[in-house]
Design a protein with these regions (language model features):
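Conserved small/polar residues in nucleotide/adenosyl-binding loops
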Residues: 1-5, 273-280
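Intracellular juxtamembrane helix-capping segments at the cytosolic ends
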Residues: 4, 213-225
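A membrane-interface helix-boundary motif in multi-pass transporters
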Residues: 36-58, 254-272
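Juxtamembrane intracellular "pre-TM" segments in multi-pass secondary transporters
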Residues: 75-113
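Structural signature of the two symmetry-related core transmembrane helices
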Residues: 174-188
Length: 282
């Protein structure tokens, strides 16, 4: 919709999307924490409280989906034989290797996918293991860790929102390159942090880098994709990101294990992925 109607605002729209997503996550987290805290004060067990948080999360999904179901207008023309055409298209993709064909034909998009895979390894590791690192390396307690998670989400929302406007002004590639430098600075700060104050700086940088890089990457996909192939391009992009969500944390864990539980070296290893991403983008 944005590509067709307002191509000059792709970054802004992407930034709004990611920023509001983080805000929604904060609201959901706040509701869950309130339920858990209240339940514990009344002597309820954690099993029932955890189940309640799942129900809350599902309810939030339902509520925020209602505007889409009720008011968003479908612009695509309905196809009489839509299901049959979908099955045919899927069979052709499998038989002809359309994904490989797209990556070979659209060189810039191929480099972006590789770049996204590398930097998302770092994003996935931060999301998955930030609390573990804070507890094991920096000695954070439960309260400090919860505050850190909230802070990272807030700065991620700010980063996504702000960089959305910035990338429309300076260009999507340059904006993404700047976010990767921000990631490298974050890792260097976190790995060298000896005090809580320095680690809080790293946490803020992580949030800014996380929101801005996700916003910039998605906008750049929209720039490279032909209008009639947007869904397919985003499918390839998301496939690379989900793969990196597995590889990143596994790499962190493997380095931690091989170095005798040295998580500082493990997080430095994650920075190598950001360097490779920056190199690929260049």
């Amino acid at each position: 919709m944005c590509i067709r109607d307002s191509p000059e605002a792709v970054g802004k729209v992407s930034g709004w999307g990611w920023s509001l997503g983080y805000v929604g996550g904060l609201i959901t987290l706040g509701l869950c924490l309130a339920v858990v805290t209240t339940g514990q004060s009344q002597g309820l067990g954690m099993d029932s409280l955890v189940a309640a948080t799942n129900i809350i999360t599902a309810a939030v999904f339902l509520v925020v989906s209602l505007p889409v179901f009720m008011w968003l207008k479908e612009r695509a023309v309905p196809q009489v034989h839509g299901i049959a055409q979908l099955k045919t298209a899927m069979a052709q993709d499998v038989d002809k290797g359309k994904t490989a064909e797209i990556l070979m034909k659209f060189v810039d998009f191929r480099y972006l996918v590789v770049c996204g895979f590398f930097y998302q390894c770092g994003v996935a590791t931060v999301i998955t293991l930030a609390a573990v690192y804070a507890s094991a390396v920096m000695g954070f307690g439960l309260t400090e860790t919860l505050v850190m998670v909230l802070l990272v989400n807030i700065t991620a929302a700010v980063g996504a929102f702000g960089f959305g406007y910035i990338q429309d002004r300076i260009g999507h590639k340059l904006a993404l390159a700047l976010t990767l430098l921000l990631w490298i600075a974050m890792v260097a700060t976190a790995a060298s942090a000896q005090t809580s104050a320095v680690f809080w700086v790293a946490a803020n940088l992580a949030g800014l880098a996380m929101g801005s890089s996700q916003s910039a990457g998605r906008a750049l996909v929209a720039v490279f994709a032909p209008e009639k192939k947007l869904a397919r391009f985003y499918g390839i992009w998301n496939m690379a990101l989900w793969l990196s969500a597995v590889i990143g944390p596994i790499t962190y864990g493997a380095v931690t294990w091989m170095t005798g539980n040295n998580q500082r070296l493990a997080i430095v290893a994650v920075s190598y992925a950001h360097l490779r991403a920056h190199e690929t983008l260049a």
